[in-house]
Amino acid sequence: MGKGDPKKPRGKMSSYAFFVQTCREEHKKKHPDASVNFSEFSKKCSERWKTMSAKEKGKFEDMAKADKARYEREMKTYIPPKGETKKKFKDPNAPKRPPSAFFLFCSEYRPKIKGEHPGLSIGDVAKKLGEMWNNTAADDKQPYEKKAAKLKEKYEKDIAAYRAKGKPDAAKKGVVKAEKSKKKKEEEEDEEDEEDEEEEEDEEDEDEEEDDDDE
């Protein structure tokens, strides 16, 4: 998204960001002419935040929730300037894309591989899963493929209902056009499915990496 686009929605703020903003405003009122040492100020804010009770943090969390809702609402109607691509905004209420047969297979066998080879990196685990899937017989793949097909069928029904609910007038007007472009749309959605699955696997791997770091 364009850095200089004035119509671009302001990014959502976290509860801690709202807290720091409040601290900054308080500091300006008390010391209007004093310059702020950013690193020292940040350190003091961080220490103060750690000692605050959940009740005290509550108002900042409410502010963050309200700002998140504002951001999501504005992003739905935001159109980036021509020639500029924007990352697709994902509505949290939209039906989630179904996993592929391979993704279901990975979900089942990933914990087993990590248990047997605790020293393996995320990349090596993914590589091993790929090798296992390629060496799995077609008959053994069927349960995953059947489950994936059922989940995809359910998703298609859910997304159709979701889209119809969101744009009833557009759905009525575009019946003829939709029929013509149905095949193309399905192909695009299949490509999106693959992209989203890769994103989901990346996110899952990142989460696992963070968990490993915490341990």
UniProtKB/Swiss-Prot annotation:
Annotated membrane topology: Peripheral membrane protein
Note: Proposed to contribute to the pathogenesis of various chronic inflammatory and autoimmune diseases, and cancer. High serum levels are found in several inflammatory events including sepsis, rheumatoid arthritis, artherosclerosis chronic kidney disease, systemic lupus erythematosus (SLE). Seems to be implicated in other diseases characterized by cell death and damage, including diabetes and Alzheimer's disease. Its nucleosome-associated release during secondary necrosis may play a role in SLE.
Outcome reported for the amino acid change (mutating S42A): Greatly reduces phosphorylation, nuclear localization
Keywords, alphabetical: Acetylation, Adaptive immunity, ADP-ribosylation, Autophagy, Cell membrane, Chemotaxis, Chromosome, Cytoplasm, Disulfide bond, DNA damage, DNA recombination, DNA repair, DNA-binding, Endoplasmic reticulum, Endosome, Host-virus interaction, Immunity, Inflammatory response, Innate immunity, Isopeptide bond, Membrane, Nucleus, Oxidation, Phosphoprotein, Repeat, Secreted
Native source species: Homo sapiens (Human)
GO biological process: activation of innate immune response; apoptotic cell clearance; autophagy; base-excision repair; cellular response to interleukin-7; cellular response to lipopolysaccharide; dendritic cell chemotaxis; DNA geometric change
Protein's job: Multifunctional redox sensitive protein with various roles in different cellular compartments. In the nucleus is one of the major chromatin-associated non-histone proteins and acts as a DNA chaperone involved in replication, transcription, chromatin remodeling, V(D)J recombination, DNA repair and genome stability. Proposed to be an universal biosensor for nucleic acids. Promotes host inflammatory response to sterile and infectious signals and is involved in the coordination and integration of innate and adaptive immune responses. Nuclear functions are attributed to fully reduced HGMB1. Associates with chromatin and binds DNA with a preference to non-canonical DNA structures such as single-stranded DNA, DNA-containing cruciforms or bent structures, supercoiled DNA and ZDNA. Can bent DNA and enhance DNA flexibility by looping thus providing a mechanism to promote activities on various gene promoters by enhancing transcription factor binding and/or bringing distant regulatory sequences into close proximity. May have an enhancing role in nucleotide excision repair (NER).
Sites where the protein binds heparin: M1, G2, K3, G4, D5, P6, K7, K8, P9, R10
Record note on what altering S39A does: Greatly reduces phosphorylation, nuclear localization
Annotated protein name in UniProt: High mobility group protein B1
Tissue specificity field: Ubiquitous. Expressed in platelets.
Biased amino acid composition, Basic and acidic residues: 83-94, 161-179
Disulfide bonds: C23-C45
CC terms in the record's Gene Ontology section: alphav-beta3 integrin-HMGB1 complex; cell surface; condensed chromosome; early endosome; endoplasmic reticulum; endoplasmic reticulum-Golgi intermediate compartment; extracellular region; extracellular space
Record note on what altering S39E does: Cytoplasmic localization (phosphorylation mimicking)
Isoglutamyl lysine isopeptide (Lys-Gln) (interchain with Q-?) crosslink, residue number(s): K28, K43, K44, K68, K180, K182, K183, K184
Induction: (Microbial infection) Protein levels increase upon infection by human coronavirus SARS-CoV-2.
Comp. bias (Acidic residues): 187-215
Residue numbers of Phosphoserine PTMs: S35, S100
